């Protein structure tokens, strides 16, 4: 395993310091804060919703040294160097987006993760196969190391990742290099969650199930608990769609689960066909395959979700699939907006926040205590307006649905430092 990134090293060190503090360690950054100690940042008066603690109510959050040090009903403003007024706002753990494209300058569709924060409230993003074995090191060294947003990744089974887009990366199956992919996952196990493969007909041509088989083999050969992330939508045949679902293991991720995209012949071969849920989809869900939204610019269809959700295939995670093309699309797949669409489909606020914090954080399972506001967790916080009233949403096939609630980003704090005011002085961030 390669060395931890500086960001994750510091997060890991904080958790160790917390444990050491209970044994009387001297100088622990996470030692219990005293009544005369000051916080670097106080987020005051917000409506805190933290599914990891089954917490909902007005709370103040005190952050010091980049770590949540207090979560109380009332913390005097005088105890903080800076105060962020969250009165009347929804305050949650920083959002965790399991499907993004955040490899600018390397992938053909990547956006700088830090540019997304104002629109997404994302403190943690997962690169969904932007890089493969040949360019993952560049993503790690030159992008992730310079980014305030916490980044993880799925390594693409194609050795060049999404660099050739819009040219398909797996028309030539020889680009799916199992050993090289396995090595990349193993050597970056602190950052690489697993392997990504896109199984649409316009990506794999006539290669059938073989790309997925190679990707699963790369996971297994890595010697790590690597997961698959499998992109569907426009699969060549209905039979192949069922084969894909049957091959997925518990804990593997089916992304674009509610896609309504047609294949190259115009046929609809997704998890809902002719208005009915595929039996293989329900079987996959029941054995523990993770259903991820991955809205994107062409991969979310209300009519699919409206059959799948009551049929037993609710999402486990809500993600954006944000990239340079989807970000300009009418569906506006910024994460809070996608969460709002699922409230329009009948999910509760608590459910959609769980699907964008606690659950994806557990899937990542790397840095301690992300996706939570527990004491000792990194100071990652999302602050949003909850706008109540009629709102209209559009999917990626121009279907419209009306909702009654919209989440709008207000402010985001990463490792205890806001993106914007109030600025930390000196501006030293991890």
Where is each model-derived feature located?
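His/Asp/Glu-enriched, well-ordered alpha-helical/loop segment
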Residues: 303-386
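Histidine-rich, glycine-flanked metal-binding segment
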Residues: 22, 26-42, 47-92
């Amino acid at each position: 395993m390669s060395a931890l990134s500086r960001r994750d090293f510091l997060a890991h060190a904080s958790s160790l310091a917390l444990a050491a503090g209970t044994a009387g360690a001297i100088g622990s950054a996470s030692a219990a804060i005293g009544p005369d100690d000051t916080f670097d940042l106080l987020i005051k008066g917000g409506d805190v919703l933290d599914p990891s603690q089954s917490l909902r109510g007005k709370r103040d959050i005190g952050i010091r040294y980049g770590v949540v040090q207090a979560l109380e009903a009332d913390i005097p403003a005088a105890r903080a160097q800076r105060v962020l007024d969250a009165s009347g706002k929804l305050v949650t753990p920083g959002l965790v987006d399991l499907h993004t494209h955040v490899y600018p300058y390397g992938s053909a569709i990547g956006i700088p993760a830090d540019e997304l924060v104002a629109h997404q409230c994302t403190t943690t993003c997962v690169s969904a196969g932007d890089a493969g074995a040949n360019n993952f090191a560049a993503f790690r060294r030159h992008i992730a190391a310079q980014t305030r947003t916490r980044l993880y990744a799925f390594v693409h089974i194609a050795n060049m990742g999404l660099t050739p887009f819009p040219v398909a990366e797996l028309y030539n199956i020889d680009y799916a290099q199992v050993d090289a992919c396995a090595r990349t996952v193993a050597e970056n196990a602190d950052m690489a969650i697993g392997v990504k493969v896109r199984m649409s007909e316009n990506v794999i041509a006539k290669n059938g199930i073989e790309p997925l088989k190679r990707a699963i083999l790369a996971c297994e050969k890595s010697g790590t608990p690597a997961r698959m992330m499998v992109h569907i939508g426009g699969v060549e045949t209905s039979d192949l769609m069922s084969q894909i679902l049957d091959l997925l293991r518990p804990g593997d991720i089916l992304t674009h689960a509610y896609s309504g995209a047609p294949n190259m012949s115009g046929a609809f071969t997704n998890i809902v066909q002719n208005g009915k849920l595929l039996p293989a989809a329900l079987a996959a869900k029941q054995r523990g395959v993770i259903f991820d939204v991955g809205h994107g610019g062409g991969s979310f269809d209300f009519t699919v979700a409206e059959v799948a959700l009551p049929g037993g295939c609710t999402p486990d995670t809500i993600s954006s699939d944000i990239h340079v093309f989807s970000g300009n699309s009418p569906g506006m797949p910024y994460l809070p907006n996608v969460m709002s669409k699922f409230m329009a489909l009948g999910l509760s606020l608590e459910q959609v926040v769980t699907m964008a914090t606690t659950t994806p954080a557990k899937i990542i399972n790397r840095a301690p205590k992300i996706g939570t506001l527990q004491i000792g967790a990194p100071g990652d916080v999302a602050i949003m307006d909850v706008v109540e009233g009629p709102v209209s949403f559009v999917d990626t096939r121009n279907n419209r649905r009306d909702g009654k609630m919209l989440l709008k980003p207000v402010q985001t704090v990463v490792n205890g430092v806001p993106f914007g005011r109030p600025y930390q002085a000196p501006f030293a961030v991890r």
